[in-house]
Amino acid sequence: MAQSTPEVTLTRLDCGTQVMNDISVRFTDTFAYPGQKLPFTFSCYLIKHGEDYMLWDTGHSMSAGPPAPKISIVDQLAQLKVKPEQIKFIGISHFHADHTGQLPNFPGASLLIGKGDWDGIKATPAMAGANVAAFGHWMNGGGKMEALSGDKDVFGDATVVIMRTPGHTPGHNSVMVRLKDAGNFLLTGDLAHFHENYDSNGVPSFNFHRGDTVASLERFKKAAANLKATVVIQHDPRDIGKLPAFPIAAK
C-alpha cells in the first residue's frame, strides 16, 4: 500500500512589532515613499510535517527593546504543546537580528541557511548586519547545520521547499509550503518588506545586491503565479490575516 503524505500545517507566531517612521530612508534606492510611515510586524512560522516540526525564522530576541515580542517563541510553542527539543529544523531566511534573535533557544534543531549568509557570518570580519552571536552554537560545531547553495526540499516530498532568493543578503531564502486544504503559500523572508515595494520591485538601499534582488523577485512572482500561491510578506501586518490567528493552524 502506498504511504500517505503526512499532514502539513502552518501557524504564524508573533515575533515583534515596530513602526517605521519614514520608509524612504532605508527601504528604497529610488527615492520612493517620501515621508511615508508604516507599521512593521516580525513574523515567524511553525510548520508541522507529520510528527516533525520546523521553524521558519526566529524574530527578534526578547531583549531587543521595543520591537521585541511580548511572548517568546518558546512560550508560544508551549501553548501549542510543542517543546523546543521537538523542533527538527530551523530555516533562516537571512542572518539579520530580526530574523535570528531567538535562534539560540533551539540548539537541538538542524539549521538551514543560505551558503552566502553562512560564509558572511564566518568571515573575518563578519559581514555588516550579520547577527553572529545567534549562530555561535552552530559555528562551534555544537549543532547540525546545512549551508544551502540552492533550493532545499526539506522533507523530501515537495511540501516544504526553501527557495534561493538572494539579493537582500547574499544567501537570502524564501519558503514554499503546500497545504492540502488552504493551498500553496509563499513566505517572502525579506525579499520584500511591504506591498508597495513588492508590487513595484522596489529595492531597499541597504540590500546586498540590486540585480540579484530584482531577479529573485521575478522568480518568486512567477512561482507564485504558477503555484496559484498565497504570498505572505512577513513584515507587512496587512498579510497577517492570510493565515488563521494563533493558535489556529492553516491546513
Residue ranges and their predicted role:
Residues 66-113:
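Active-site metal-binding motif and surrounding structural segment of the metallo-beta-lactamase
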Residues 1-82, 86, 182-189, 225-230, ...:
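Metallo-beta-lactamase
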Residues 34-38, 163-168:
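Short Gly/Pro-enriched turn/cap motifs at secondary-structure boundaries
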Residues 174-176, 181-251:
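Cap/insert and terminal regions of metallo-dependent hydrolase folds
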Residues 15-16, 58-61, 95, 116-117, ...:
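Active-site metal-binding loops of divalent metal-dependent hydrolases
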Residues 90-100, 165-172, 233-237:
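Histidine-centered catalytic micro-motifs
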Residues 64, 72-74, 110-112, 167, ...:
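Short, electropositive alpha-helical surface patch
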